[in-house]
């Protein structure tokens, strides 16, 4: 390969930096085992807060903190019915990332909590 030095020395355009910031925010919001379980649940069905808290094993207070981070990145949406708030996720980006994680770690999302992120070579 013949790389020209002047080409590699050019600074990245501002758009690249902006894209990297957006991607980092997205990945940061997902970078928690409980948030992965929350998103995995919400892409499959809309859920009320109480049911979601029970399903993922969190108090409603702890769940609220996680949902706040996911809402900040627009990874979940809400719907109110009287006094009940329902959450769901239909983000294509979330579906793609969860699909990639499933391909790497298997179909059982609970395995994401149990398996190391880097596999040891044999």
Swiss-Prot record:
The keyword Nucleotide-binding does not apply. One of its GO terms (molecular function) is DNA binding. Keywords: DNA-binding, Nodulation, Repressor, Transcription, Transcription regulation. Residues 49-68 bind DNA. Residues 15-109 form the HTH arsR-type domain. Transmembrane segments: none annotated. It holds the Pfam family HTH_5. SMART domains: HTH_ARSR. R.meliloti strain 1021 has a frameshift mutation in the nolR gene that disrupt the protein coding region. Binds to the operator site in homodimeric form. Negative transacting factor controlling the nod regulon. May control the expression of nodD1, nodD2, nodD3 and nodABC genes. This is Nodulation protein NolR. It comes from Rhizobium meliloti (Ensifer meliloti).
């Amino acid at each position: 390969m013949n790389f020209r030095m002047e080409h590699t020395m050019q600074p990245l355009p501002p758009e690249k930096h902006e894209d990297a910031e957006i991607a980092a925010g997205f990945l940061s919001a997902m970078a928690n085992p409980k948030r992965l379980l929350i998103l995995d649940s919400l892409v499959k069905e809309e859920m009320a807060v109480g049911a979601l808290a029970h399903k993922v094993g969190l108090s409603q207070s702890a769940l609220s903190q996680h949902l706040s981070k996911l809402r900040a990145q627009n990874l979940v949406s809400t719907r109110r019915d009287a006094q009940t708030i329902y959450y769901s996720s239909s983000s294509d980006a979330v579906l793609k990332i969860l699909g990639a994680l499933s391909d790497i770690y298997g179909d059982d999302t609970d395995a994401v909590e149990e398996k190391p992120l880097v596999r040891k070579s044999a």
